[in-house]
Amino acid sequence: MGKPEGKVEDHLIKKAEANNCLCYKFTSPSNNGVPDRIVIGIDKFGVKHTDFIETKAPGEKPRLLQRIIHAEMREHGATVFVLSTKEAIDRYFRQFFEPEENANGHKIPD
């Protein structure tokens, strides 16, 4: 993917694979504004995740229709994230899927 958004999406896919998560392209025919990807996995606490991820190019925000659809999905119990940088994707995976590190930088075992 040559576009900046594509680079962000590629990073999401790589991080999902590295963290033993599924990362599916999400399309919903006749429904514009839905998130780009679904990440499915079990986090470092044993909690099952099915997260909808909207990837954007750095500095871009979701369009009005996307914001409306994301809000509607959240109102129905879905978890929706908008991630626009590689750093935001890294934070998402650190928060949920990557093992904690101690003060010395060593991974704390599960």
PLM regions: where:
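Catalytic phosphate/metal-binding cores of nucleic-acid and nucleotide-processing enzymes, i.e., regions
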Residues: 1-110
